[in-house]
Swiss-Prot record:
Record protein name field: Probable cyclic nucleotide phosphodiesterase Psyc_2036
Chain residues that bind Fe cation 2: 70, 100, 179, 218
Native organism: Psychrobacter arcticus (strain DSM 17307 / VKM B-2377 / 273-4)
PANTHER family cross-referenced by the UniProt entry: CYCLIC NUCLEOTIDE PHOSPHODIESTERASE CBUA0032-RELATED, PHOSPHOHYDROLASE
Chaperone keyword on record: no
Length: 279
């Protein structure tokens, strides 16, 4: 079994194949096979486990799994225990960071969002912050963009200083992973809950030419954007999806749960694509 958290990834050919999953939103630690209900709770549980099984059945070698936040829909240690057991059982190195739901519970989930009460929760200690993973040719920088008791995110001054130090001290191509998006996705409602100091973040990191890629969750949709030489990937949820380019909250019921592959090549180039759950 790989130790947690992973700090180095070594592969036979130097290339690192990363499986990104995000926004699991689990509300139960009961395995999907033991839950005979058709509730949203059971659906999220099933799709998480089914996506892991489907992704790892592909011909592509998986070298690292990165989980970019919102592992749970309510903060309970037993749910994290279950998630970490599923990931450990793959035998593949993995790393998890927090999203807003990992540090915030909601009351009145049946109410419109603005009528709900947000409750501050402490992050599970297994969720990583300012964590470096290195391979022969790449460096992956994992950030915790969550704010306890809030939906929106923030990259703190300490986080920014740490990223700048890593990018300055190591010339390897770099990937940053965090939960909240740092470029708008043209949906007013979710863009009001992005990383609130994204512009400041960009000002500090753009001078570093070795920064190639940023990956995030939070948006529950697939998007690819480019900003001054940096490619930014938003990745679908392993559960339910949000309708893209909608200013008001809306589910996208036409697309299935998904996950993202990233191939980090030895020459600093990146290939990435999204796959959807088959059944």
């Amino acid at each position: 079994m790989p130790s947690y958290p992973v700090s180095t990834v070594n592969t036979p050919d130097g290339q690192v194949n990363v499986l990104q999953i995000t926004d699991l939103h689990l509300s139960s630690h009961v395995p999907a096979s033991d839950d005979e209900t058709s509730s949203e709770v059971a659906v999220c549980q099933y799709s998480f486990e089914a996506i892991i099984k489907q992704a790892l059945s592909k011909e592509i070698r998986c070298d690292l799994i990165v989980v970019t936040g919102d592992l749970v829909n309510k903060v309970e240690p037993a749910i994290y225990d279950h998630i970490f057991t599923v990931l450990q059982d793959t035998g593949i190195p993995f790393a998890c960071i927090a999203g807003n739901h990992d540090v915030t519970d909601e009351t009145g989930e049946d109410l419109p969002f603005y009528q709900r009460t947000l409750i501050t929760r402490a992050a599970d200690p297994r969720l990583l912050s300012r964590h470096l993973i290195e391979s022969e040719h790449w460096q992956l920088l994992l950030l915790d963009s969550s704010i306890t008791g809030k939906v929106e995110g923030e990259i703190t001054a300490t986080d920014i200083d740490w990223v700048r130090e890593q990018l300055a001290s190591c010339t390897k191509p770099a990937l940053i992973a965090l939960h909240h998006h740092v470029l708008p996705v043209d949906s007013e409602w979710i863009d009001s809950h992005m990383a609130k100091n994204a512009e400041e973040f960009w000002q500090h990191i753009l001078p570093f030419e070795n920064l190639r890629v940023i990956i995030n969750g939070h948006t529950h949709q697939e998007q690819t954007r480019h900003h001054q030489g940096v490619t930014v990937y938003s990745t679908p949820s392993t559960c339910y999806q949000f309708k893209p380019f909608e200013d008001n909250f809306a589910y996208d019921k036409k697309v299935r749960p998904g996950y993202r592959w990233l191939q980090l090549a030895n020459n600093g180039k990146v290939a990435s694509w999204v796959e959807r759950l088959d059944t």
